[in-house]
């Protein structure tokens, strides 16, 4: 350990304070509002009470500061999520489009990303073995896309300050989450 003082320092900090999570990591921004969160919950038929929602959703650290989860659920999360579309099969291909989502309540961002999947899912004609009718084939499976997006957001290592990355190529979609399964 003496040869690696940074690792030793990190290990002792981990043993003393535990693993950094979105619940115990203070938000980078403390002047947060939650109007959109109330609207989102209301649209699902769930009533949040202003007096208790912070405790019920565990939006504060033990020191009373807003935590990272509060920042993610606030009206401005300061966390952009980008969808990059390339014309070919690699990042060396021309960049066709970049669409930015986020900087919003993460629940709204998730809904927007899932709706954008409908735009991306181009129907292609499969002319192989055609007799009379051609077969319409979507670019990807809707359910698989939905599951991958939700997992990328849920399992992302938000405490490291990185967002999931979605890249669309001519033959596939890559959804990268900077986290691990718990």
What is each PLM-predicted segment?
Residues 1-182:
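Active-site helix-to-loop segments that bind/position phosphate- or nucleotide-bearing substrates
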């Amino acid at each position: 350990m003496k040869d690696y003082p940074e690792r030793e320092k990190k290990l002792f900090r981990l043993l003393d304070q535990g693993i950094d999570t979105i619940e115990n990591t203070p938000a980078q921004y403390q002047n947060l509002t939650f109007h959109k969160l109330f609207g989102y919950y209301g649209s699902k038929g769930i009533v949040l009470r202003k007096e208790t929602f912070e405790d019920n959703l565990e939006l504060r650290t033990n020191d009373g500061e807003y935590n990272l989860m509060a920042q993610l659920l606030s009206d401005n999360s300061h966390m952009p999520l980008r969808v990059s579309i390339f014309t070919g099969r690699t990042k060396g291909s021309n960049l066709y489009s970049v669409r930015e989502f986020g900087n919003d309540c993460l629940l709204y961002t998730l809904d927007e990303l899932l709706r954008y999947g409908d735009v991306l899912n181009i129907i292609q004609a499969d002319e192989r073995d055609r007799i009379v009718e051609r077969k319409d084939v979507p670019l990807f499976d809707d359910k698989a896309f939905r599951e991958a997006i939700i997992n990328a957001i849920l399992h992302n290592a938000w405490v490291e300050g990185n967002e999931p990355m979605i890249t669309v190529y001519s033959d596939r979609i890559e959804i990268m989450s900077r986290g691990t399964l718990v």
